């Protein structure tokens, strides 16, 4: 039997049948190399496939520079500087995010059509603690999400380079239920800080060491949904670290925020993402059925005014709702 038919709800690069799939799914040697890296390590490095990349990178840096007070950050700032969804104002950001060759590549790697839903642009290092995107952006079926980090300039070792933990993507996707948490008790998402002690202990348990991506301008790193990654400390604030991250979802899924969800309690913090390539809001689906968000309910937006219900009543209500 075709392995694709056995597990259609698992990304091809995450499939336990990867070795049987590889040659047929990716006849191109370079694409097969990228797939193998993602399967083994949870990330893959590529040269961004854009002929005019240098000019586009310069345009992004020039247009976004005025939005940041980098001098003040150098004197007083902690953490990082960022702008989210600059694709709405700047075509160059949108062009990189929705690049047809990237979309085709990701679609071939995952086995479903990819589309971009969020961009983040940084002039300096993020200095962000190690985390997985899966607690922020998840899907059902799980793992149909990835990120593409792009170097908009050569990255210096003291500029707070991207860090990642190879192989961490193979860990289970831990959520509120495994941590003994109920988001409803907190009135919404709790923040990734509640997960960070677990991630630190898992790193020690598995003996993993952080690797740094000393990228040159035009290189990109694809990471899978559950890869542990973050930003190293920026040791020299004289350096910039211009970069762009685009987050991607895939067709035929439901998309939600696990940190703010208690699915078995009837609370799912669904996302209503916009496809950057088309500008259209994408609808959540489950096994081909569109999920009506007004029926399922957005977590916490109605919780404050909703009468308290038992766990059984919540689950029973969900079981008898129509999702088509």
Q: What function would you assign to each model-found segment?
A:
Residues 2-16, 20-24, 70, 178-180, ...:
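Non-heme Fe(II)/2-oxoglutarate
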């Amino acid at each position: 039997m075709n392995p694709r038919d056995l597990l259609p709800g698992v990304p091809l690069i995450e499939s336990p049948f990867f070795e049987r799939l590889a040659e047929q799914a990716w006849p191109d040697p370079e694409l097969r190399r990228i797939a193998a890296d993602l399967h083994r390590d949870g990330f893959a490095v590529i040269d961004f496939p854009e002929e005019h990349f240098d000019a586009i990178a310069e345009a992004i840096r020039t247009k976004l520079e005025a939005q940041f007070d980098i001098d003040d950050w150098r004197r007083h700032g902690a953490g990082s500087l960022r702008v989210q969804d600059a694709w709405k104002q700047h075509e160059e950001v949108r062009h990189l995010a929705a690049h047809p060759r990237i979309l085709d590549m990701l679609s071939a790697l995952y086995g479903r059509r990819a589309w971009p839903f969020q961009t983040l642009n940084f002039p300096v290092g993020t200095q962000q603690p190690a985390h997985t995107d899966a607690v922020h952006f998840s899907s059902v079926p799980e793992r149909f999400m990835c990120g593409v980090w792009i170097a908009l300039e050569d990255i210096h070792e003291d500029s707070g380079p991207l860090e990642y933990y190879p192989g961490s993507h193979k860990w289970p996707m831990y959520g509120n239920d495994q941590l003994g948490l109920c988001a409803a008790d907190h009135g919404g998402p709790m923040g990734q800080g509640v997960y960070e002690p677990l991630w630190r202990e898992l790193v020690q348990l598995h003996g993993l060491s952080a690797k740094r991506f000393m990228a040159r301008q035009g290189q990109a790193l694809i990471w899978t949904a559950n890869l542990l990654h973050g930003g190293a400390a920026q040791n020299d604030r004289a350096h910039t670290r211009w970069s762009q991250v685009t987050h991607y979802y895939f067709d035929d899924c439901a998309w939600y925020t696990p940190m703010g969800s208690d699915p078995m309690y009837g609370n799912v913090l669904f996302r209503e993402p916009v496809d950057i390539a088309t500008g259209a809001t994408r609808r959540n689906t489950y096994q081909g059925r569109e999920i009506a968000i007004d029926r399922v309910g957005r977590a916490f937006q109605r919780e404050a005014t909703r009468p308290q219900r038992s766990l059984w009543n919540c689950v029973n209500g969900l079981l008898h709702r129509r999702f088509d």
